[in-house]
């Protein structure tokens, strides 16, 4: 039985590893339409010892990323589980880079805005070169575990995505 909420579609701004279609395909088991966009009023940071970035509000900041178009509620729950409890899903305004259209979308904001582990600018091209392969292999394992009755907890997900492993 389908509820109307499960049929609702969402647009989600991503700014880290989820910009990569190969990663999204593993996460969602499909590749949705992806458009380039800019998120004003935020800044992206690297996180010490982690393979993924975070964003926090910043008056003069601007983050370039992608919007995943037409994400289902079930897929959004998968993204929520992967992002874990260090991020908060919020609604923000982005500007599409292809047509300058402004849109309200969901994104994941780092909860601890004063986190001492935040530093420097996270670089997508560097991530692809150095970490993409490991990231995809790890997520394939995680998604397989999630399909099993016992599943794998959110804490396990964040621990396997450390730079020092």
Swiss-Prot record:
One of its GO terms (molecular function) is acyltransferase activity. Expressed only in seeds. Keywords: Acyltransferase, Transferase. It holds the Pfam family GGACT. It comes from the Eukaryota. The active site is at 83 (proton acceptor). InterPro entries: AIG2-like, AIG2-like_dom, GGCT-like, GGCT-like_sf. Induction: Not regulated by chemical or biotic treatments. Its EC number is 2.3.2.-. Substrate binds at residues 15-20. Belongs to the gamma-glutamylcyclotransferase family. Putative gamma-glutamylcyclotransferase. This is AIG2-like protein A.
